[in-house]
């Protein structure tokens, strides 16, 4: 996963922070998108994307030695968190050759496996040093997507989180990496697999993964609100708000982070489950998939509207457009749960019907999600799941639950079909293509 270059990296003077190397020039692939007005007119914006720093070659600032190889840190360069930040730098990326990331005009394709690299995550940039920030309230976000080459167990995701616009550059003295090198990631799982958090290496307490040759779990995590516009493959899709107690990125420690990476899933300051709308899970098994109403064998358009009432987020609506037809989101077919959009009433009823703990409400629900929605970064990714094989998206989950019970079945994939060993060997050529991104007031983009 991590690029090995053979060029010199300059020594950078910092006290603590993630540093930028100079072995390879960082050139962001261009990606145009459109900003629309209430009148319906749209203006093209010349943007670009940047690769997340977690995927990058991490090496000594004054040489070629890997700070991180496979899923382990170099004990000499990284004996502790602060020393690691002083001694190590992340470097530029060869987007296509190493990571399988290509762009063409308004289109971005992410390949699943390229050489030894698995998956990728990129952010939309305003300029070379700053992430593009979005204010979602009373606006809509629209894009085209082709998921026809995404089988069971894969996730071609498009979502927003409350990352810092500069990747944390201004918060940590001497940080020479920042958004230009894709730093500062956070989400509602409070992920602990991030190598550098808040200008420090995540070395102390690091445990290499037993199943993922490129990853591990450290002593720190990084939390922030997350709005999943699109988590999908060709079989299933879901959109999900995940609020947190803080609207900004925060650091956590150990199991108090909660989320996927901790023993106490609900022990943190964020909602790792969210309030999801998955049409299959909501009882409409013929709405989305190959040959379905939304036919995933060909490209289609996804529209998501963030409706505010008195300045507070009150509803998240979904429409699709395919073959020139506007298609509203499917209606819930679950007894006791009404509607085809995410509202506070829908979320409460859904948690009750499925017997799920209402962590969403405990962390402020839609109102808290709306509080965070004024400044969010756009993220596009392709990934597989070493924790639950993506069964929460496209199969029956939990694995020991009766699939006939409400909320258990989320798609038609067999349990185990998404095992990373299976998908990485049998579907290495998988990919997702996002294109034609538009953003503007409700009703302006389609």
Swiss-Prot record:
InterPro entries: ConA-like_dom_sf (IPR013320), Glyco_hydro_7 (IPR001722), Glyco_hydro_7_sf (IPR037019). It catalyses: Hydrolysis of (1->4)-beta-D-glucosidic linkages in cellulose and cellotetraose, releasing cellobiose from the non-reducing ends of the chains. This is Probable 1,4-beta-D-glucan cellobiohydrolase A. GO terms for cellular component: extracellular region. It comes from Emericella nidulans (strain FGSC A4 / ATCC 38163 / CBS 112.46 / NRRL 194 / M139) (Aspergillus nidulans). Transmembrane segments: none annotated. The biological conversion of cellulose to glucose generally requires three types of hydrolytic enzymes: (1) Endoglucanases which cut internal beta-1,4-glucosidic bonds; (2) Exocellobiohydrolases that cut the disaccharide cellobiose from the non-reducing end of the cellulose polymer chain; (3) Beta-1,4-glucosidases which hydrolyze the cellobiose and other short cello-oligosaccharides to glucose. Keywords: Carbohydrate metabolism, Cellulose degradation, Glycoprotein, Glycosidase, Hydrolase, Polysaccharide degradation, Secreted, Signal. Its EC number is 3.2.1.91. Induction: Repressed by D-glucose.
